[in-house]
């Protein structure tokens, strides 16, 4: 599903929230991100500031959390001290391989991971919403610098 302002508005209204200009602007930023790019709250704040969109950092944090709870964004732990976010596109499942030294992140697809997630959630009586695997390791470049 591709999220639009209309679908976001409908989802928010269903849950008793409204589509504010700030929420719509944040959604637009994520829709326009290049594939494979993830933003932290601070990254998003700086991006919006550079576009003269004065949205406070606290509003950004609240909006990111809300959109993640609603399933519009995926919250990612990319081996840094803060979360990153990306647009959740259910038909584009992918996983992350992260270097713990330099934070380089590679996205990859694996039908096996998705099948295991689906099978496990079904076995336990869960309805699968998302399935993601994050692998932490040391990239080849950082391995060479450790020698």
From Swiss-Prot:
Q: According to the UniProt record, where is the region Dimerization? A: 91-147
Provide one Gene Ontology cellular component: cytoplasm
Show the Pfam families listed in the entry.
Answer: FUR
- Would you say which domain of life the source belongs to? Bacteria
Can you say where in the cell this protein is located?
A: Cytoplasm
Instruction: List ligand-binding residues for Fe cation.
Output: 93, 95
**An annotated GO BP:** negative regulation of DNA-templated transcription
Stretches for region DNA-binding: 1-90
The UniProt subunit note reads as follows: Homodimer.
- Family that this chain belongs to: Belongs to the Fur family.
Q: What does this protein do?
A: Acts as a global negative controlling element, employing Fe(2+) as a cofactor to bind the operator of the repressed genes. Regulates genes involved in iron scavenging or photosynthetic electron transport.
Instruction: Write down what this protein is called.
Output: Ferric uptake regulation protein
Q: Which gene encodes it?
A: fur
